[in-house]
Amino acid sequence: MTLSHNKSPDLRVVKTHKAIREAFIILLSEQEYNDIAIQAILERAKVNRATFYKYYSGKGDLARQMIDDFKQEVSQLFQDRLNADSQMLQMIMENHSQKMFERRQQMLALWKIRTQHHNLYHDMFLMGKQNFIELAKKQKATDYLTAEAIDYQATMMATIFMASLKYYFEKDLPLPKKLPVDWQQMLDIIKS
């Protein structure tokens, strides 16, 4: 966003970005990404073409910027998880779960964009996988697990995490606090 003299952002610019992005999210919730025309975004956001192109080179650029912004937020959540000590972990996880729930409509809409250049769902999967690998290193799991075992576990953890987000958020429900217990119960059932 454009800053005027290194002070706070121009409120008109902030409102314009917000209107365009909200319009795009609404359209994504109603139709497929490839079916959305710039004109539909303009009409929904109530901005003219020149204003749109002042900030975005096209629909793909809008998607890229929104996905990049969202990925920065998710990256911070994963970083906070990695840096949390055991005493703060529960509070941090509940806080982050709430933040993700508040952004669920945007997340679900952006997940619908699956192109060669834009795929937030896959990007979040990879971020979750990498976070698990970093946690394994931090907890010295690399001392007793092979790299292949850690890669497998990271892949499975990212898969179940993303599927859980999708499952609950599509039902308009927050992630339950007992989610790890649910996962453990699944393992218990398999072992029985």
Describe each model-derived feature in a short phrase.
Residues 16, 20-28, 100, 128:
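Short hydrophobic clusters on alpha-helical segments that form packing/core surfaces
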Residues 12-24, 41, 66-70:
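Generic hydrophobic, amphipathic alpha-helix propensity
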Residues 115-142, 148-159:
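Amphipathic alpha-helical packing segments from all-alpha helical-bundle domains
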Residues 78-106:
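Hydrophobic alpha-helical connector segments
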Residues 137, 158, 166, 170-192:
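C-terminal peripheral helix-coil segments that are non-catalytic and often amphipathic
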Residues 1-13:
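N-terminal intrinsically disordered/low-complexity leader segments
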Residues 27-61:
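Helix-turn-helix
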